[in-house]
Each structure stands twice: as C-alpha cells, then as structure tokens.
Amino acid sequence: MSHTNKIAYVLNNDTEETASPSSVGCFDKKQLTKLLIHTLKELGYDSAANQLLLESGGYQNESNHIQTFFKLIKTGQFHLINWQIVCSLPLAHSSPLRSEWLQRLLIPTPTPATTSLFDHMLLQLQYLQQLMSSVNSSTCSDAEIATLRNYVEIMILVNRQIFLEFFHPVTNSASHKGPHTALPVLYLRKILKNFIEIWDSLLVSNDQFLNEENIFNPETTLRELSTYLTNPKLTAQLNLERDHLIDAISKYIDPNELVPKGRLLHLLKQAIKYQQSQDIFNIIDPDDDASFSSPPHRINLLQDNFSHDLTVTFQEWKTIQDTTDEIWFLTFSPNGKYLASATSESSRGYFITVYDVEQDFKIYKTCVSLSQSVLYLMFSPDSRYLVACPFSEDVTIYDMNATSLPDASATDSFLLYPSTRLSPMDSFKLDTTTYPDDTESSASSSSRPANANSNQSRVWCCDAFHTAERAGWMVVGSPDREAIVHSLTTKESLFSLKGRTCIALGHDENISGRKSIDPAKVLYKPTSSNGNWQYVEDDETFPRVHDVKISYDDKYVLLMTHQGVIDVYDFSGFPSKEELSKQTVDPKNFLIPRIARLDVGKNMTCISLPLNTTHQGFHRQQISESQHLVLVSLQDNELQMWDYKENILIQKYFGQKQQHFIIRSCFAYGNKLVMSGSEDGKIYIWDRIRGNLVSVLSGHSTVMSNSTKPMGKNCNVVASNPADKEMFASGGDDGKIKIWKISRN
C-alpha cells in the first residue's frame, strides 16, 4: 500500500472521527464545517470544497430557498419573484409573520406568460397595500413590524435592480440605442415610490430590531434613482449590479442558513485585534484596517500577534512663532480650516491671530479692538464666527467671512500683516441689573461681582448650541455668578440660569425638608429616564462659572464652577428658535432642572468634551461610546474622566505638572487619546480607556524674549483638529505654536 493510500485509509477508518462528537470544544462541528466549505470556495478551491461537502454528509452553506432566490436574481428572472419567495427567506433576529398577514401576501395568482414585469410588481405592491390596512403599531409588536419591514426592504432592493436594468436593455435589434425614458419614470413613480412610502411608515422609533448596517434612507434612494434618469451612464455593469444586490440581501439572511461573505477572515481580524489590544502600548483604532490591507505586511496566523512597541508616533510637523508673548489659548474651527490663537498681555496691544490650516498656516485674520488679554475662544458650529472672552466685560464676535480692511489711523499699526486686520462685527456685555433674581440676598457680599462698582459681569467662557433648532445661540459663563443663553443673531440675552434652576431627584431619593416644585413649571422633555423625577427648589447661591460646555445634541449644559463641582443641567425641554419666535413659550416663566452634580472636590482649570467628527453645518449625530464623557483638568497634577450623565468617575490620568497655572487638555485621535499641556513645557499623552501614559513630548522650553520679562516654560494648551484626527497643536510660554502629526506605525 502506497504512502498516499495509507493516509487515505487512516483518514477513512479513523474510529475517533466516526465517534467524534457534534462539537469541537465549545464550537459546533457543523458550523465549523460550513465555514470551511464557504472559505474554500471564496479562495477558489472549489473541488476541495465539494470534497469536504461530500465527506461531511452534505452541509449546505445555503438553504434551497436561498439558492432558488439568488438564482432568479443572477439569471434576471425577476418576473418569478413574488411575496411567497421573499417571505420564505429565513431572516436574522426576526419573529415569524402573522398567519393572517401571510394569507394576504401569498394569494395564489397564476401570472400569464404575457404579463409584463411592470404589471407583476404592481400586483405585489397592491397585495402589500391591502395588508397595510390591517397593520397597526398599537396592536402589533415591534418585532412583528420589524420582520415585515425587512421583507419590504428586500422587495425594494429587488425593484431597485429592476429599475436599473431598464438602462441595460437586451439588444434585440441593432437600432436599439437605449431605454425609453417613459418606462423608468413610470416604474419609479408608480411602484418604487409607493414601496418606499410603505417602508417609511413601518419605521419604529427606538426599535431594538433595527439593523443599522442594512437600512437605507428612502429620501437618498429616491434621489439616487432620479439621478439615473438624467444620467443613465452612472449604472454599472449588469452582472456587477446583480452581485451587489445579492450581497445586500445576504445581510438580512440568518447566518445559520447563509454563511456571511468573508466570515472566516472577519473572525481572524477580530482575533488579531483582540490580541493586539492586550498590549498597553497599542492605541486601539477600530477604523484602522491598514494592517490587514497593506500588501507588504503579512500577519502570521500560526502564532499569536503581540507587539510591545507603540503603535502610533508623534512628530513635530511645523513651528509657528509670530510673537514672543505667551500662548494662552488655541482652538481649531469645527471644519478644521482655521486655528485661532490668543496671547497674554503684549506691549504691541491685544489681538487674536487666525491661521489658515489649508494654506500651510498662513495668517488669515488678525482680530483687533481688544482692550485686554483673551481668556477664551470659541468658533461657531458652522466655523463662521469667532467669539472671544477677554479679561474685560466685553464679549467680542468676529466674522471669518468678512473682508479685512486696513486702517492707517488705527492704533494697531504694529500688526505684522495689516492686510489681515479684522474688526469685530459685534460685542456685548452682560448687564446684571436686567434679571429679576438680583434680590437683596443674592446681591450680598458673598455673591456680588468682584467688580461691584459695575453693573456688568465679566465673561470668561462660552460654548455654542449645535443643532439647527438653536443655531446662533450660545451659553456664556461668568465668575460673577452668571450663566446666560445669548443669541448671536438677535443680539439679545434669552435666559439667565441664575435664580431659574431647580434640582431633579430620582424617585428613590429623599426629598424631606426640601420644597417641592410643580413639574409643570419645569422645562424638560419627558423620557423613560426622567419619568420618575421629582423637582425641588434650588436654594443655593448660583456658583462662579469658570468653564461651560454644551453636549452636541444640545440636551445638556455643563458648568464648571469655582466651588469644585460640575453642575449638569437638562436643556432638552428648552424652547427652540421657532417656539420663541411664535412666543408659544416664555422660558423666563420656567425652571431648568439640574440633573447631576459631579463632586470633583478640587480646583479645576478646564473641562473638555469628546471631539465630534461630523462638522458639516448643524447636526444631531451622537458620539456613541464617549457621548457623555467630560475630561477635567485639575490644579493637582491630575486629570479625571467622568460620565456626567451617570455621575461616575471613570478614569484618572497622572504625570503632568499643574499646580499654579491654567493648563488646558483635550481629547485626541478620534477620542482614543487624552492629552494635556504641563508646567514643565511637555505634552503628556494617555490612552483614554486604560489611563496609561503612552508618550511625553518635549514641546516648549524656557527662553528669554527681547524684553526684560523672563519667559516661563509652560505648555499652556493643546488642541485637536476635529476634521483631521492626526493633527493637534500646542502653545506655550515661549510664544511658539507647534503643529503635531500622529501616524500609525
């Protein structure tokens, strides 16, 4: 017997194999076999896959129903696709359709051979329309509606393909130049549009069965198909479009009935990413698949993949030094186009420099007419306006789209580039006498502004609302115990939190000794989380506000106070611009609930929210895993990460030096990193989740300027570019702005 035959004999007569269990460890043997067969076919080993199929007893990768359905698509026999075939597909995470629904959809109607495809699909649409008359969300479960919606989506995908194939006519005659425009237009209007309208009506809010990977937007789909009418050349090759249709429908199918495309490779990627995640020097970036797609890089599948090297590097890319004054504040615009810089007091005057990031950081605007040093800068969400909060009582606003006008008579002739001179478009002060809560008690020595001889409050911080409903609004905070909602467009103060707040308590919290508040007087939007809240009077003196942040969905306003706490207010019920314009709600007659208080207990210098990478105008996108995080810089050589909604301290970061000055920190690299300046001139970078220090950069050093004033070596501020996760900037006492780049090894 030859060696080969011996191997075959042993394999065929292995008693251990015949008596083998139905599982291998915790894995199902049938699933493993199906996965191997599927992968062999994807790799082109069809004969080996067929041999394994025979030896395993015929484990099919897809059921007969699925094979029949996909064959109809590949051969273009769409006139044979009906609700009976579609509803026979086994869907993932779905419940069976009601029997009475199936009876209405699966009406046996033999279609004559002469019936057109248009009439056939019109009949399927009519069956669905008849069914929808009995579908009611109040009597049907979300799971039932989700199943019906998935089948409707599959039928829409099929009809979309039918529509596209109008632009690939069968060339029965040489004179045929292309499709008649009337038929695609009619099909889109009479069939596809009605299918999509029904699908839209089946959407369930907060649907736990909604698969984000599979749904498509009806408005986008209609716009896309309408584009094909005007430019039919956009359609791809016929076979390629049918393959895409099969791939799209495959995502709806139960994986136990159809092995997902590339499943084994996907599992291997997950395993390698998990192995790499165990290394504390690995910066996890789920969006980065470069290591799996780079041809020169080969991953060894025969051993574990660990690396003890830092997976990202930080490189100093550019140094800007247009001043010898200390850099106090840096901020990128939301669209990443501008970088604004504010300096300390200067013998040349006070101004803000705005750099054009896209033009190699050339000076774009020099904002003038400031009477004192600027403590805080903020760009509006559309990146058009820059708001400056100086030491003085004036909040100054600049329009980045305005034309720069040199002024020979101006006192700021010291400017390096007079052609970039930009005057304010507006400025305002907070008048503390205009609010009714300035009672004798609130104006006592403990709460009176430090500049008590003035009726205006200083403004040291601000942040803008982000959604379209509150576009042009911002919250300004004052160390003189004020926080006010101000409109940039109408140039008026809309609401003062001082004296207009209450405290929200859970149903299990003790309210004894507290004065209850009628919920009708509270501005809040009822949800499942606040349905059991009780509201009590807030009898505390309004705090001194040193920093303010607004969540990207505009639901929460965070005030960092001088008292060592961060107060979180629920603004979800605050009226929109439309409601205020119609005067349906007067917010001055209501209270804003404080839903949380983060008891940090130490002196804080700034707070930061995660970066929002969507920057095209106004938006509602949330930031998934990190949407309720706030980073706190402490004057105690420490940073803290809190979940402000749950009032939980999540992580602490140590290493940087901060005891005497305001040092600012930020999120970076798609919110995977946390970074901060330091009083030793260095930049400290941590892994956001683990809290370990991953790098320390030598950023800024002690220098002596041309003046007699000695310069410190603080790195006062770091700022990330929200439109380019690989870019951040730092500013220090040496007057330098350094631009840094992050790259993966």
Curated annotation (Swiss-Prot):
Mainly resides where?
Answer: nucleus
Which SMART domains does this entry report, sorted A to Z?
Answer: WD40
Domain of life according to the entry? Eukaryota
Where in the sequence is the signal peptide annotated?
none
Q: Which GO terms describe its cellular component?
A: cytoplasm; GID complex; nucleus; peroxisome
| Region named Disordered | 433-454
The stretches annotated as WD repeats are 322-365, 369-408, 445-487, 540-579, 613-652, 657-696, 710-745
**Compositional bias (Low complexity):** 441-454
Keyword terms of this UniProt record: Cytoplasm, Nucleus, Repeat, Ubl conjugation pathway, WD repeat
- Any keyword Cytoplasm? yes
Entry's Gene Ontology BP terms: negative regulation of gluconeogenesis; proteasome-mediated ubiquitin-dependent protein catabolic process
Q: InterPro entries, from UniProt? A: WD40/YVTN_repeat-like_dom_sf, WD40_repeat_dom_sf, WD40_rpt, WD_repeat-ST_regulator
Tell me any Pfam family this protein matches.
Answer: WD40
Q: Where in the cell is it found?
A: Nucleus; Cytoplasm
Quaternary structure annotation from Swiss-Prot or TrEMBL: Identified in the GID/CTLH complex. In the absence of stress, the complex exists as an inactive anticipatory complex (GID(Ant)), composed of VID30/GID1, the E3 ubiquitin-ligase RMD5/GID2, VID28/GID5, GID8, and the RING-like subunit FYV10/GID9, awaiting a substrate receptor to form the active E3 ligase complex. When cells are shifted to glucose-containing medium, the substrate receptor VID24/GID4 is induced and becomes part of the complex, named GID(SR4).
Other facts: Present with 1200 molecules/cell in log phase SD medium.
- Name the protein family: Belongs to the GID7 family.
Q: What is this protein called?
A: GID complex subunit 7
Source organism per entry reads Saccharomyces cerevisiae (strain ATCC 204508 / S288c) (Baker's yeast)
